[in-house]
Amino acid sequence: MVIAVVVAAVCMITLTAKAVFGQASCTNTPLLVNVVASNDIAPAVENVANAFNNQNPTSAGRCVQVQVDQADSATEAAQIDGQAGRQGAAVDAWIPDSSLWVDATRSYPVGAQIVQPTGQSVARSPLMLVTTKAVATETGVFTAPPGWALLLPSSYGGPPASTGISVDLPDPTTSAAGLTSLVQVSRQLGTGPAARTAVTDFALGVQSTENFDSAAALAQFVATTQPPFDRRAITVATEQAVLGYDKNTPKAPLDAVYATGASQPLGTPELDYPYVVTASQPAVLRAAAKFGNYLQSSYAQSVMRAYGFRSSNGVPDVMPRSTELAAQQLQLASAATPAEAAANLQDWQRLGLGFRDLVLQDVSPAMNQPSGLANLSLEQLLAQTASKGLGLFPDGTQMGVWLIGKSSVSHPYTEAVPIGPLSANIGVLTRRADIDQIDATATTSPSGSLALYDAILDAYRKMSASYAPQYVNAVIVLTAGNDAHGDMPASSLVAQLQKLYNPNRKVEVIALQFGAQGNFQALQQIAAATGGAAFQVTNPAEIGQVFVEAVSQRVSG
């Protein structure tokens, strides 16, 4: 009886030790290694960590225990590099979904000091273009050889407009899949002003969405393609997320293709799930490195494949035939360089800023001249163009209007609409409706004298003094291009704008000249002094393209 009690007690002690420490031999306080992994791969990493803990690992004479938390890669990157406050325990090792986040954190002094790449990849997952079987059948969007042009407008080689395809792009500021896709589209379009305009057109046309990094997220995407929404949408997701969705809904799998890039090598981009060490204590650093090596073991890699990832060398698990996914290694696209990713992300972020514009609308007698188009005067051409252009600005745009070329006692302009949100009410009308009404009803002044350059200078001073960093700030000039007043030569205005220009508080002049009788060369010089641009408009149908070119200039200038 006594022996039985002793044996029972020993068993109880042993079981208790295993429950607390995850290993029978840990008789001292364990050396904890806190690992934070991307949300999608965290369950697989936790599975491997449990197996690692049960093998009685030690470091510097102490037992080691790994605990795994999950976090969004973008959020964790901001905390590690010091751009956001840290919540919870310090991180000793980090597994983001892409090396893009490692590059981003190391671009900051804090991140460069803390983040220590190991060169190890825990797993991989290629990116795929995804839609539903129904949308793919209705549109034939995947019948041609797949490429990143599928995300582009039809004018740049994308699907015909008649297909009604819309693009849901995971937000490149928070999604490695989205940023990688943006880089691939940029490569597809090449370099130069025309390519920059095309990228802008693409960015303005897509819908920025959450990251479709799981089966549940893809289910939300699929729901938008069904009644009552019935969207014909395409998006980008990892192979692992597609496999997860197909496993959950085997009777209605997704239609997904590997998109081939435009630059050599002509391969498919992927997320590479790097393992980086962030520990500061030498003992924890060694323990974290030990777990990193274990993640490369055959057992750990088999776990990654079981969870739908490819192993670190790109080898996939056996895949269900219904998904029609590749059960072999893929030809990979070259990874985005840090500079390439940063440049594309910067442009995207500037496009994400709202617009804050002061519009100068010419109503001088010069606007009575014929435009040479369907018996329209320049003023009528401007009115049609302005109405079309206004429709291209989102409701969050801040906008005001000055009429120039109309007699004014103290100013070379008349304020028609004060600056504010287009969606806000001014009396009974919204600001958008008020501006649209002014465009439609504005008449030229029979005796006004256009002090164009004085008005531009006054507007530039006002916008500079009231600069709002959360917007792209600009003075937009709609004019025939003639300064009839003559008090200030163009060269003087250029010199003054150059003095006022502050690259850290950037205000651009964007000039649209109507007709060919004005001094377009002067407008080009004036706009260039502020990093802006000038355009000639001869047809209202051109305004869409002019708008995209102007926005492209504002983003990259």
Regions found by a protein language model. Name each.
Residues 481-530, 535-537, 545-550:
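VWA/integrin I-like adhesion module and closely mimicked acidic/polar interface patches used
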Residues 1-16, 278-361, 369-380:
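Extracellular/periplasmic juxtamembrane helices and adjacent flexible linkers that interface
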Residues 133-149, 265-306:
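Extended ligand-binding regions for polar small-molecule ligands
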